[in-house]
Amino acid sequence: ENLAKIAAMIGQTDNSRPAAAGLPRLAIEQQNETSEGDVLPKGSFRLRMGDQSIYAKELEVRLFVRYYSYDLWNNANPELSIRTVLAPSLSDDFPDTSGGNKCGKLSKDEVANLSSNSIEHAKQKSIKCTQVVYGVVTSADGSKTIDGEDVDVKGTPFVWSARGSAFMPVANHIREVPSNKIMFGQKAKVTTKRNVNG
């Protein structure tokens, strides 16, 4: 056992995770249940680490960096979906995988001039802007697996694609960081709140 640890420490063996594993992904659980019928805590934060998901109602995090991206998802053929590069400002150029910019996203004024029942108007509504945020969990009281097993996720790095109802709260938090402070030095408590539409 000690020999194996020493071999790993000096680089003799490669104990790294597979490259495809990537960073754990933070999201807000949108589903009510799994495909097997297990109940999921909809509205809780989900931290997907490999093939395991950990849930928490509230997290404390430090956000290190925020980028923006656009995508136009193709449900029929996901491999034909269009995505842009990541950029730190909405005023930056966003070259996309189709050779265009911002997946073809028009300005608000241009969209307002489109007929509401046109194909282009429908396409514009399908182009989504996402904030891609990299951070680390500083505390997560009550974080558990779906089976109720307690898991300590303190110190876990994550990537969070904040879009939809999560977009503005993240943007507002970053905007409110005082100009004499750096975002990654600030801890933030993040919670979810159920909104009823309609």
Model-flagged regions — what are they?
Residues 1-151, 196-197:
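OB-fold ssDNA-binding interfaces and closely related basic DNA-contact patches used
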